[in-house]
């Protein structure tokens, strides 16, 4: 089902992603979009393999236990087990935050795997099961014969997807910047900057380098 801007009545949505944890960029975008949909009166069922973190009572989560040990086999298992759940419910839209078959809408948080693989690896890499799995997932979303509508967060992504999969341009929808207001510099940012420099004895002509690593 394609995107139709005039459809403003309450919808029943399925949100699908492989894993949720509160510190991932994709996952944070997922949660912001989910809360906005709830605010507008839509209902959402979430399907995932794993959920780490608190749950919203208005956001029911179905955990699907995949088979297999490797990531690509587990994802294949998740997609296969997901289909009966989607068939049992009259969903208006199936929205994916990872590349997988059967999506009406895909939120493109990841870059083009095909472009990255060909730039970083030789031809031998394309023989691996992992490569074949990830390309098949991309084709299921971006192939010219598919109907999935694509929400982009970067215009630069579109060229690669169109190059490798001949995706029609009209299926791409560029989203505005989604920076949270609490991440924007406040009106007293200059005062805070001066106070921080005084606290750590940093002169006006000196730079402070802050190195951050995440290992959640």
Each PLM stretch: what is its role?
Residues 95-96, 100-131, 151, 174:
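Active-site proximal beta-strand in glycosyltransferases
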Residues 185-202, 208:
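A short helix/loop element that forms part of the nucleotide-sugar donor recognition site in Leloir-type
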Residues 68-94, 131-140, 210:
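An amphipathic, basic-hydrophobic alpha-helix
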Residues 3, 17-23, 36-73, 85, ...:
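N-terminal strand-loop element at the rim of the active site
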Residues 18-20, 177, 211-216:
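Conserved donor-binding loops in enzymes that form glycosidic bonds
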Residues 151, 203-216:
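Conserved donor-binding/catalytic core segment of Leloir-type glycosyltransferases
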Residues 158-187, 200:
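Helix-loop-beta element that forms the nucleotide-linked donor phosphate-binding surface
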Residues 130-153, 158-159:
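Membrane-proximal helix-turn-helix segments that form the acceptor-binding/catalytic region
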């Amino acid at each position: 089902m394609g995107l139709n801007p005039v459809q403003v009545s309450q919808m029943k949505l399925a949100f699908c992603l492989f894993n949720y944890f509160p510190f991932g960029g994709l996952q944070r975008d997922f949660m912001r979009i989910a809360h906005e949909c709830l605010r507008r009166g839509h209902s959402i069922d979430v399907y995932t393999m794993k959920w780490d973190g608190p749950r919203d009572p208005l956001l029911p989560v179905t955990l699907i236990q995949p088979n297999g040990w490797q990531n690509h086999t587990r994802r294949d298992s998740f997609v296969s087990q997901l289909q009966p759940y989607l068939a049992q419910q009259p969903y208006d839209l199936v929205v994916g935050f990872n590349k997988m078959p059967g999506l009406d809408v895909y939120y493109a948080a990841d870059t083009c795997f095909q472009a990255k693989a060909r730039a970083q690896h030789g031809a031998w890499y394309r023989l691996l099961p992992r490569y074949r799995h990830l390309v098949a997932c991309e084709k299921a979303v971006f192939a010219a014969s598919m109907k999935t509508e694509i929400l982009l967060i970067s215009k630069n992504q579109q060229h690669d997807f169109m190059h490798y999969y001949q995706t029609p341009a009209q299926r791409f929808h560029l989203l505005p910047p989604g920076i949270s207001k609490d991440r924007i510099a406040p009106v007293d940012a200059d005062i805070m900057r001066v106070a921080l420099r005084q606290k750590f004895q940093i002169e006006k002509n000196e730079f402070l380098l802050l190195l951050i690593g995440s290992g959640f």
